[in-house]
Amino acid sequence: MFNKVIMVGRLTRNVELKYLPSGSAAATIGLATSRRFKKQDGTLGEEVCFIDARLFGRTAEIANQYLSKGSSVLIEGRLTYESWMDQTGKKNSRHTITADSLQFMDKKSDNPQANSMQDSMTHENFNNAYPTNYNAPSQDPFSQAQSYPQNAYTKENSQAQPSKYQNSVPEINIDEEEIPF
């Protein structure tokens, strides 16, 4: 079966970092994401989704070092189901994301150390601390695209034939201050 989640959201709280008995880092983050839609009566509605994500290994340590409440991130991973009994014997459950990779989405800061870390995380997969039964990809997924044949498409060809849709798409100007979280 295919189980892949890609989510962009903002942290709802600071990173909670712990170390497992094996010495590997494990972190939990809370994400909030929203979707805007038009209701039947024509008014705009908004649906907000809150979900926890689990990070492991170096990814957990980097998240703890550079992220805080309100930071914007992109998480790629898989959906997992957790169930447990509380102290009163009541059964509880929830879905979480077990992250395979993490990308910072905020604007680059004035901190050169954070900038270089953000650049290096864009194409890397930090999943070195998963249990041994998890089959992590052994190579960079972006490098696989180079093995496919490329079409003879050049910039000159694209400019020689103007698209009939070229001027029909309106430009959207979104101010980050207008984002609700």
Swiss-Prot record:
Protein function: Plays an important role in DNA replication, recombination and repair. Binds to ssDNA and to an array of partner proteins to recruit them to their sites of action during DNA metabolism.
PROSITE patterns linked: SSB
Gene3D superfamilies per the UniProt record, alphabetical: Nucleic acid-binding proteins
Signal peptide bounds: none
GO MF term (any one): single-stranded DNA binding
Pfam families for this protein: SSB
Annotated GO biological process: DNA recombination; DNA repair; DNA replication
UniProt keyword annotation of DNA repair present: yes
UniProt-recorded name of the protein: Single-stranded DNA-binding protein
Cross-referenced InterPro entries: NA-bd_OB-fold, Primosome_PriB/ssb, ssDNA-bd
Keyword tags: DNA damage, DNA recombination, DNA repair, DNA replication, DNA-binding
